Amino acid sequence: MDLFLGGVTTYAGLRDALVEHGDFGRTGMGRLRDLHNALRLGAKVREEISERLNDHGIGHLPPALPGNQDAEVRLYLKNTPVGELITAVLEPTRRGDELLVGAVSGRGGDAESAEKLRLIAQIVGGR
């Protein structure tokens, strides 16, 4: 799940890397800073990175990007099953509740969805 961004030079390339890694992965803030062609991870740069990720359909955890270049972040494609599960956890709705229950109970979800939900619970819980 670690994203190797050695050859990635654009946000579109980052999106492609996520697709190759099952729509989810983790990387360091220093790599995102470099992708953004910034020198530092100040508040404005972090906000711009978040906006650019969003423009490409990429979500991130934690919701507020950290300013430490060594901090690890999780990236996911928003309009995918894993993205929908993460959104269901972070932005509760009735539909999201049904999605979560279905993912863990086997109703409306498969084993892969249940495993992704387990991973999401670990990430959101900080474990």
For each feature predicted by the language model, list its residue ranges.
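Extended alpha-helical scaffold and adjacent linker segments that couple domains
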Residues: 2, 27, 36, 56, ...
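Positively charged, polyanion-binding regions of nucleic-acid-associated proteins
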Residues: 5-30, 34
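Generic secondary-structure transition motif, activating predominantly at the C-termini of alpha-helices
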Residues: 18, 22, 36, 53, ...
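Long, compositionally biased intrinsically disordered regions
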Residues: 1-2, 82-127
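Charged low-complexity interaction tracts in eukaryotic proteins
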Residues: 54-95
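Charge-enriched amphipathic alpha-helical scaffolds
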Residues: 13-14, 33-34, 38-67
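Residue-level signal for secondary-structure boundary elements
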Residues: 22, 26, 44, 57, ...
